[in-house]
């Protein structure tokens, strides 16, 4: 087993509801609703779908006082920590703090006067909630646009440090920071520069990354690269897609880097003429059937005996394709044969049984350690 070479950057630990961000806390996955916030039922349903996908933190846009009231109703109906996304009107921030927001996403620079910022910080302090400073390349201050000519890593850093200085002067330190851009290199440059200046947790993201496929690729490159350098404490994959898809992709990135496990790590061959069954159809069916599982485990499904045994030995459950019967490996050892035309049903049964065994072992360990 190759040792994971990633060493995370030391950061402060803050809290977003029941979820810790930074320090030794696991890298958390976030998403954001795209429903009308005032449509409480639709927003709650979307948050629940993200919760089912494993999301740690959800962000909800609150553009008006009417939306703030709706936010309060949403807060009562979901258990996932909620970040209220607020711009321009500090009164909305004060309202959602009263309604139970777990974090306020603001730019201190567009909330208004120093007095208004002080009121928002006082409300956050009173309610024990955190703040996220969100800097975006598309909304840089005009003087920085003039100074740098275009969005640059240095420009994003300077904007972030301005906002950080405001909170520092108010002796408020329960905050995380993001410096997002839609360009991969600009995003990475900005976060690298920021990570050298502060020890606050960093919220990673490529803003307006694009539609599902291209946005996934851009996010995987930028955020994966930063994570490999130890930069990042929480992340959102911003896609023109369903929020629950953002969650799944976020976990896939973390799983691929060995930083966090959530559900099944599927290992499958791309298939070729050697395959003894239709690998693509089998994997599509398994992914759909097993998407409810959150217990970490490795499942290897290889269509022939060329690479199948080697991959199977490294997985919790491994399948080596053959006809009419395929070979099953359990925990790296040969186990038994199964009918190849019954693969999907057989694999699902084995996975669910393995999940049961893992969870029972965890429960016994908890009982032993607490006795």
UniProtKB/Swiss-Prot annotation:
Protein known as: 4-hydroxy-3-methylbut-2-en-1-yl diphosphate synthase (flavodoxin)
Entry keyword annotation includes Zinc: no
Listed InterPro entries: Dihydropteroate_synth-like_sf (IPR011005), Enolase-like_C_sf (IPR036849), IspG_bac (IPR016425), IspG_bac-typ (IPR004588), NO2/SO3_Rdtase_4Fe4S_sf (IPR045854)
An annotated Gene Ontology molecular function: 4-hydroxy-3-methylbut-2-en-1-yl diphosphate synthase activity (ferredoxin)
Family per similarity comment: Belongs to the IspG family.
Native source organism of the sequence: Acinetobacter baylyi (strain ATCC 33305 / BD413 / ADP1)
Enzyme class, spelled out: oxidoreductase
Coiled-coil ranges (or none): none
Lineage: Bacteria, Pseudomonadati, Pseudomonadota, Gammaproteobacteria, Moraxellales
């Amino acid at each position: 087993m190759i040792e994971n070479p990633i060493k995370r950057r030391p950061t402060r630990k803050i809290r977003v509801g029941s979820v810790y961000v930074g320090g030794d806390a696991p890298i958390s996955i976030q998403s954001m609703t795209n429903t009308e916030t005032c449509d409480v039922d639709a927003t709650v349903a979307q948050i629940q779908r993200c919760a089912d996908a494993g999301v740690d933190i959800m962000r909800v846009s609150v553009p008006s006082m009417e939306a703030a009231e709706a936010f309060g109703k949403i807060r009562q109906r979901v258990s996932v920590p909620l970040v209220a996304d607020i711009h321009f009107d500090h009164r909305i921030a004060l309202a959602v703090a009263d309604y139970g927001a777990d974090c306020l996403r603001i730019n201190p620079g567009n909330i208004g006067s120093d007095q208004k910022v002080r009121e928002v910080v006082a409300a956050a302090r009173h309610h024990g909630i955190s703040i996220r400073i969100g800097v975006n390349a598309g909304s840089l201050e005009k003087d920085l646009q003039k100074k740098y000519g275009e969005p640059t890593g240095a420009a994003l850093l300077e904007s972030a440090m301005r906002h950080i200085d405001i909170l520092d002067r108010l002796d408020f330190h329960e905050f995380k920071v993001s410096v997002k851009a839609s360009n991969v290199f600009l995003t990475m440059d900005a976060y690298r520069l920021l990570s050298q200046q502060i020890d606050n947790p960093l919220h990673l993201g490529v803003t307006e990354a694009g539609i599902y496929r291209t946005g996934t690729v851009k996010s995987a490159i930028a955020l994966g690269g930063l994570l490999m350098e130890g930069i990042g404490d929480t992340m959102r994959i911003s896609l023109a897609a369903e929020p629950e898809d953002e969650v799944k992709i976020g976990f896939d990135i973390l799983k691929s880097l060995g930083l966090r496990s959530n559900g099944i790590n599927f290992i499958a061959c791309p298939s070729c003429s050697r395959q003894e069954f239709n690998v693509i159809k089998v994997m599509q069916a398994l992914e759909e059937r097993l998407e409810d599982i959150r217990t970490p485990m490795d499942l290897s499904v290889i269509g022939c005996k060329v690479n199948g045994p080697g991959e199977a030995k490294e997985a919790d459950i491994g399948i080596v394709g053959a006809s009419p019967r395929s070979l099953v490996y359990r925990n790296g050892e040969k186990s038994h044969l199964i009918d190849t035309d019954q693969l999907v049903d057989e694999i699902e049964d084995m996975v669910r049984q393995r999940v049961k065994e893992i969870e029972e072992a965890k429960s016994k360990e908890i009982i032993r350690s607490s006795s």
